[in-house]
Amino acid sequence: EGFDNVGLMVGDREKNITKILLALDCTEEVIKEAKEMGAELILTHHPLLFRKPSTITTDTLLGRKIISLIKNDINLYSAHTNWDSVKGGLNDTLVEILGFNEGIIMDKSPVDSQAGIGRVVELTKEMTVLEIINLIKSSLDVKNLRYAGDLNEVIKKIAIVNGSGQDFFGDAKKLGADLIITGDTTYHFVSDYKEMGLNILDIGHFNSEWPVLIKVSEKVKERLG
């Protein structure tokens, strides 16, 4: 996505890598863990450097992280919306974990027709909202989630957007989805689209990405040998 910042955030492109630590975010705890385990590379989903910092000092959390990475010779690489949208990435893997058929892309990439944000799947067997909630809880090990809609409504078509997906509520509705599964949502978006007949399952940003990231990491391990 044009607004995003992905790739090598901090480090040396020529560095030989023998151990990688996968994380959703580059926190100070993650950097400490990478140092203790001897990982030369931290691979995160969310970029540490989303916008250019005006200063890099120990006065700020961001500055401390960058300085710590450099001091400990740890590289940081982030794959965000590119990892969401690519074929076989987070969106597709979430669909796979939930046991649905391969979906169509909601918002296609202008540079790759097989990539894009969000997926819409047609169910081979109709399910109620409650049945889908139970499926999510068991498949992603989610204890609690927020929903808006009718638990007994029969669902035929589902939109799925990992992470913050409320900007795609309109696309989901246009594509005929009865329900959307996503992460961060806000009151007014949910209230309006519920009125328009869209059931909404907010499973949490972390829950919509971390279990999926673990699954994707298995594919990365296979590729790296």
Set out the residue ranges of the language-model regions:
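Active-site catalytic microenvironments in core metabolic enzymes, especially phosphate/sugar-handling
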Residues: 1-225
